[in-house]
């Protein structure tokens, strides 16, 4: 069986939940992805019959960023069934999840329990490898761009709670943040999202497995 690379974890969710709604049409997609020679191909989703809704565009961004940052094996290609979103360069099946945190003024709260369930539901599925046609456990690419840092910590906590008997399943979760803005110069870099002392302690426990 082909093996996946070691799972990737982001330092913190990007906290850009207020910008997800901007990414609904091709012209709204950052040039980093829109101008890539395979971006158009990655937006050809069999589940949407040629339509390109914002969800499909964002999934293509996630997959391409995972490839360009070396988090999955290149080249990625769009899934050819409605059950997965893309394959990595060795044909391994991936599903993309792009959870959304509430923005200022929203009257709903992030449901870490529910999002964890949707991720685990995919992790318990199998799908044929694109090249070998051997059934393989589905991996999940978790795009944390549109999440608050504290919501990602809560989601990780729920995933660990729900997998006490089989933590190894979480090795098939790969985290990524897409780049919605061009890289800033050193003297123009925005301040990173700061975590509270409690959040930092929880993150440390998650990283050390304690």
Task: Kindly give the residue locations of the regions a language model identified.
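Catalytic toxin/effector domains delivered as secreted proteins or via bacterial secretion systems
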Residues: 4-209
